[in-house]
Amino acid sequence: MKRQLPTFVTFVLVLAALGLSYGAGMKKKVVAPKDFPAGRPFSAGIQVGDTLYVSGSTGADQKTGKVPERFEDEVQLCFDNIGAILKAGGYDFSNAVSVQVYLTDMTLFPRMNAVYIKNFPEPRPTRTTVGVTALAGAAHMEVTVTARK
């Protein structure tokens, strides 16, 4: 029994050290461009370790809240907004590993895709595209991104 106690204590100390080092690297850090509007009920991005989770972004102008009339301009502005969040965390589109796209009209898919491929370099991230009935404001699309260094 006396020999087992030091082994058990060593085992517990090793587990505790592993738990502390794991938890220390898992702190959440808010990532946002300097011009990200204040007072929103969500963060633009959250970095945990080397992974950045970007909130759903639309093609609305960050200052005016207006969505461009031409859909392709809305898509590009959406990716510009995402790019600003990525850049604020020291990432870019090449770091994207997963993308979720929400479209209010699936007939817009080919037009969205044409702009999408100009923004995401090869190898492109995994992607899910979902048709939805509505999004906030006048947005026709919303995109979330997970990026990793």
Model-derived features with residue positions:
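N-terminal presequence-like segments and the immediate start of the first folded domain
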Residues: Q4-D80, A84-G89, S94-V97, L103-K149
